[in-house]
UniProtKB/Swiss-Prot annotation:
One of its GO terms (cellular component) is extracellular region. This is Major allergen I polypeptide chain 1. Heterotetramer composed of two non-covalently linked disulfide-linked heterodimer of chains 1 and 2. Residues 1-22 form the signal peptide. The gene is CH1. SMART domains: UTG. It comes from Felis catus.
Length: 92
């Protein structure tokens, strides 16, 4: 499994251990969705809503390009599937 996919799964696991409250604000869900399935421009535009510093935006683009290059479509679908299961889990 690729490093970026592992990070997404670790983030998801932390949600489950964080006291059982998996309510995630829609903005975070949108960020994660764009990070995994959006274009680099869409993701950078989303990041710019929170922090429009050039260095932050450049790092966001580099990270998104890296994820797109390293993760397969199947990896991304698997990560989204895990997140969907967490969002709908009765443990949350």
């Amino acid at each position: 499994m690729k490093g970026a996919c592992v990070l997404v799964l670790l983030w998801a696991a932390l949600l489950l251990i964080s006291g059982g409250n998996c309510e995630i604000c829609p903005a975070v869900k949108r960020d994660v969705d764009l990070f995994l399935t959006g274009t680099p421009d869409e993701y950078v535009e989303q990041v710019a809503q929170y922090k429009a510093l050039p260095v932050v935006l450049e790092n966001a683009r580099i990270l998104k390009n890296c994820v797109d290059a390293k993760m397969t479509e199947e990896d991304k679908e698997n990560a989204l599937s895990v997140l969907d299961k967490i969002y709908t889990s009765p443990l949350c």
